């Protein structure tokens, strides 16, 4: 591992190699538009909306030139000729009644062209728009409230790795647009130019960031600065980009020391020097204390929280943001990552944290989606992740080498049920979706039927007969007796969705991980209350001189299954403190189930704990 390369820091996704994007050869005459070594385009366009009410914009165009004496620029019927001074020609246009780039509603793009006397030409697309972020009101686009609600995306795919074709990128964009998202966090590195182009064309507001991840490397400063310069210079003209990301979870495996702080100060200063028109941000790991000085460096802040999945309870997400907002009313705060892994093969009538069921992923996102909707002051929120992605350090949830937090599977063939939850919240396209299409065999006599829809009323039918009509908001649940094979249909107006269910005598073992197939009750007999058991509070048991070391050994083993990042962060003092706070609320059983422990492992631990008296 090269300690001078920021991209080589540990991270919870697969690092691919090779040349996986287009390579072009440029043959140019003596007089030509420059090809900068940092990969920047020849034209740099800076549109500033100077009067939002009148829609007046000032557009500055700079051309990098070699050998020529002048450049003629053209924009919307206006032509300006400018001399070349020190390799650059500059023209300033005024657009009256400019057609604004207005997000997904109207992503209008202008094209400016430049021409040399020898006929050489260059052009660039751009958009006129105004971004504002208010700590009390959230994100604004062109003067109107425009809460950024969307997803994060890694640019890999099953059987293609990171070498996505333009067609594949178009398919990704279509899926993101289907749920009605208006923002994408492009994690955790620079993405293909074609995808930025798609975001310009479709109106998605973008968070773009460099691969400065998890662990600060003392010798990596120069590389992080180079990465930031290349990111900004190459993507400066894209109207979709609203913020530059300085780092991701950089304190997960690093202490907040002066070297780390100085690295971020320099990145922040560089970003503003290269681009005074955009804000800076960073995604902070959940255990970073809100009093940390690193939060004072970027213009706006954001946190990655996983309460209700990796640790703690769902309600802690609400509590965290409400407290932060109350404690720091002058700071802008966003929700840069949240999610729960789900293998769509796994289904349950009683889903729980750590079971990797699609059923629990629904419960998780139902809570978070409502929490977000109730807090418009969250300037941006991004589901982690739109798609399952490769994470070679992981071995969990029935799959090796995948992070399964996506709303869509790694091969893009299956939309998990929470995909439709966000469609219900964000999309204007009317629809009805019945959840649980993969939960066919059901052992319960009365089963829960869940419907996601953005329509106000849904009717449920069993075998063609009306069961019940409900009014609701996004999520509709019905309790339905079942006796055999049934066709279940949800209808709202002309929209409908159908699934099949089959009453069985016992749970289908294929719906649970191998280590949980026969779980009904962990224990056959009574527990001795004078001794420790997995039903006891985790923090209390950890404090016991005999039970504590046993539990620590097990928790370390569970962390290792989460991959390279989990192994790196386990000794982080801030994480230890966060885990201790979480343990105040949780039983040993709950912690183990969340970590994916098997039935036999939990039973065996309980036998051991039942042999240790409480002192």
Stretches with model-predicted labels:
Residues 11-18, 29-31, 41, 99, ...:
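Flexible, active-site-adjacent loop/turn segments at secondary-structure boundaries
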Residues 30-38, 118-119, 369-370, 389, ...:
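Short amphipathic alpha-helical segments with coiled-coil-like heptad repeat character
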Residues 60, 173-176, 183-414, 418-425, ...:
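Substrate-binding/catalytic cleft of secreted carbohydrate-active enzymes
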Residues 29-55, 396-399, 413, 556-580:
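Intrinsically disordered, low-complexity coil segments
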Residues 24, 423, 427, 606-614:
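A short, amphipathic alpha-helical segment
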Residues 522-614:
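Compact, charge-rich alpha-helical regulatory domains located at protein termini
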Residues 21, 108, 366, 379, ...:
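Short alpha-helical basic/polar micro-motif
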Residues 1-186, 203-206, 227, 237-243, ...:
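Secreted/periplasmic carbohydrate-active enzymes, especially glycoside hydrolases
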